C-alpha cells in the first residue's frame, strides 16, 4: 500500500475547467474557489471535518447558473477520492455519522464498495440558500457517488432550516468519509471484501 494516499484530477469541458487535489491523510487544510460561494462553504466542511487536505479550483459558466459547476465539481472530487484510495487496501470501508446543527439532525451512512448508489432524503423547504439552488445539493451527491463508486445513504432525522440541514448533511458526510477511508491496522494490506476486490463498477 502506498504511503501517499493523494491524487490530482483535472477535468475540462466546454462548460467548466476544474482541478482537484486531495490528500486523504491530511490535516483539514483547504484552498477552494469554485465561483459558487455556498458550494465553497460546504466543500470547506468536507475538508475540515474529514481532515482531508483539499485544493479545488473551478471556472464555470456560472453566468448561466450554478448547475454545471456544482455537478462537475462533484464528478471531479469523486474521481479524486477514488484515485487516492487506489485498490482500497486496508481501509475501514464503511462509515456512518449523525451530525446536529441546532434543530437539524442528519445521518449519513456509506460504503466505499465500488457500487455507486444514492439514497437521498433531505426535505429542504427553501428553494434557495442565498443564491444557491437547493436542488443542487442532490445533484452534487449524485455526481460524487457515480464517479467515486460509493454507496451513500443520506437521511434527515429532523430539521426545519434548510441551511442547517444541508450543512449538517455535509458535516455528517465528511465524518463518515473519514471513518470509511481511514486505515484499519488489523487489515494491513488486505482489501476489505470477501471477493478480494473493490472496484468502481
Swiss-Prot record:
UniProt keyword list: Amino-acid biosynthesis, Cytoplasm, Histidine biosynthesis, Lyase
EC class of the enzyme, as a word: lyase
GO cellular component, one term: cytoplasm
E.C. numbers: 4.2.1.19
Tagged with keyword Amino-acid biosynthesis: yes
Reactions accelerated catalytically: D-erythro-1-(imidazol-4-yl)glycerol 3-phosphate = 3-(imidazol-4-yl)-2-oxopropyl phosphate + H2O
Domain of life: Bacteria
Cellular localisation: Cytoplasm
GO molecular function: imidazoleglycerol-phosphate dehydratase activity
SUPFAM superfamilies: Ribosomal protein S5 domain 2-like (SSF54211)
GO process annotations (BP): L-histidine biosynthetic process
InterPro entries for this protein: IGPD_sf (IPR038494), ImidazoleglycerolP_deHydtase (IPR000807), ImidazoleglycerP_deHydtase_CS (IPR020565), Ribosomal_Su5_D2-typ_SF (IPR020568)
Pfam families noted in UniProt: IGPD
Pathway recorded for this protein: Amino-acid biosynthesis; L-histidine biosynthesis; L-histidine from 5-phospho-alpha-D-ribose 1-diphosphate: step 6/9
Family membership: Belongs to the imidazoleglycerol-phosphate dehydratase family.
Protein name per Swiss-Prot or TrEMBL: Imidazoleglycerol-phosphate dehydratase
Gene: hisB
